[in-house]
Amino acid sequence: MGLLIGDDLWAVVIFTAIFLLLVDLVHRHKFWTAHYPPGPVPLPGLGNLLQVDFENMPYSLYKLRSRYGDVFSLQIAWKPVVVINGLKAVRELLVTYGEDTADRPLLPIYNHLGYGNKSKGVVLAPYGPEWREQRRFSVSTLRDFGVGKKSLEQWVTEEAGHLCDTFAKEAEHPFNPSILLSKAVSNVIASLVYARRFEYEDPFFNRMLKTLKESFGEDTGFMAEVLNAIPILLQIPGLPGKVFPKLNSFIALVDKMLIEHKKSWDPAQPPRDMTDAFLAEMQKAKGNPESSFNDENLRLVVIDLFMAGMVTTSTTLSWALLLMILHPDVQRRVHEEIDEVIGQVRRPEMADQARMPFTNAVIHEVQRFADIVPTNIPHMTSRDIKFQGFLIPKGTTLIPNLSSVLKDETVWEKPLRFHPEHFLDAQGNFVKHEAFMPFSAGRRACLGEPLARMELFLFFTCLLQRFSFSVLAGRPRPSTHGVYALPVTPQPYQLCAVAR
């Protein structure tokens, strides 16, 4: 068979183009109804891929919301997406319509990152029996190993002591606190998953954290969106390895830790940690093809805990110290409250939180202002729903825009400024706020929220009890514009720490 040339080649090109346009037209036809949310006109085949800045999604969605309203649509290649904005709409979606919107969209890239038919972890698992099984296991096991109890609080307090000692060694010169914060929070997760802590100088520990940090954004950027929208590209030999090198390296490191841990597991003894508890469930489930307890899922549950439990908390603490050096008046008031309630002799305890309204307000405001997971993790409709006057078909990807809630101008007095008074009443008492949802809401709310709250309070108060933090003299003030990824991190900065 000869090569196509001349008119024959052009005929094939034109036919292919017309075919793709017809496929695109048929695919989006059901969404072109009077009751489907409005949005920018998609390009054939590409949809709105070129109209959304995936390196700064919050700003792109902010501009689109100002034009199309609180509920608007996008099309990413052939994938329909609806974005929900504002407190009222987001809460209604996640809570009132929680049963119908708790599913996850199919993200083909994760099939090349260890996900399979019976191995989807917890965070990205479809809403169904396997997700319920793994979430129930995770919640109950976290509780069994101390979340919400004095035993884990003591572990966190001990780790906070190690962190403060390391800060004291670094205090002779300016330093970036982010990596030390990551090590401290990672050791809390390691205590739950592996029943051990790592020395901060441990080479394997440092390699693992460095790889994890370098992986930020690999699965959330523009290329990842293109591959999810056009998954046939993932069949190109070698491409997934080139697009996700650090994520694959981190998975390999987790596998190495799990292999070593299994060697010391004794099923006749009580479980030492979550990994032992999972292995025990695997043993019970032998011969049950429907069980989600398997080696592949063990790896993903552990990765979920590191990603959701370590990365978010350490990033929030990094934001907290940045905001303290930029707002010395706020830092001074935190110092005063710590001195009054706790003093300088004993370590902070969770029982102190109720008597420290200003410190509690500061921590909440850090979470609101930092806004580290602005677009949430995508949801998906499991049936057709009528929402806010629109018809959203089954199988539509949903983006609950948490940033639009945490920065809602109709709710917060100073939405774009760091203002701890958002969480204080006129008498200085701490007040909860329904628009405070950094952990999301509804059925997919973060299962590690109780642990995160404990860590944030204990690490933050321990550090502020022992140190005063400041910007470097004669240097430009650090920026509060974050680096967009999952999570949103502060731009690299340094601080000075002085023992109190």
From Swiss-Prot:
Q: Which reaction does it catalyse?
A: an organic molecule + reduced [NADPH--hemoprotein reductase] + O2 = an alcohol + oxidized [NADPH--hemoprotein reductase] + H2O + H(+)
Q: How does it sit in the membrane?
A: Peripheral membrane protein
Residues annotated as transmembrane: none
Q: What induces it?
A: P450 can be induced to high levels in liver and other tissues by various foreign compounds, including drugs, pesticides, and carcinogens.
Q: What class of enzyme is it?
A: oxidoreductase
Required cofactors, per record? heme
Q: Which domain of life is it from?
A: Eukaryota
Provide the E.C. number(s) assigned to this enzyme. 1.14.14.1
Q: Which GO terms describe its molecular function?
A: heme binding; iron ion binding; monooxygenase activity; oxidoreductase activity, acting on paired donors, with incorporation or reduction of molecular oxygen, reduced flavin or flavoprotein as one donor, and incorporation of one atom of oxygen
Q: Which residues carry this modification: Phosphoserine?
A: 249
Tell me one GO biological process term: xenobiotic metabolic process
Residues that bind heme, according to the entry? 446
Q: Which Cys pairs are S-S linked? A: none
**Principal place where this protein is found?**
endoplasmic reticulum
Query: Which SUPFAM superfamilies would you find in this protein's record?
Result: Cytochrome P450 (SSF48264)
Q: What does this protein do?
A: Cytochromes P450 are a group of heme-thiolate monooxygenases. In liver microsomes, this enzyme is involved in an NADPH-dependent electron transport pathway. It oxidizes a variety of structurally unrelated compounds, including steroids, fatty acids, and xenobiotics.
**What protein name applies here?**
Cytochrome P450 2D26
Q: Which gene encodes it?
A: Cyp2d26
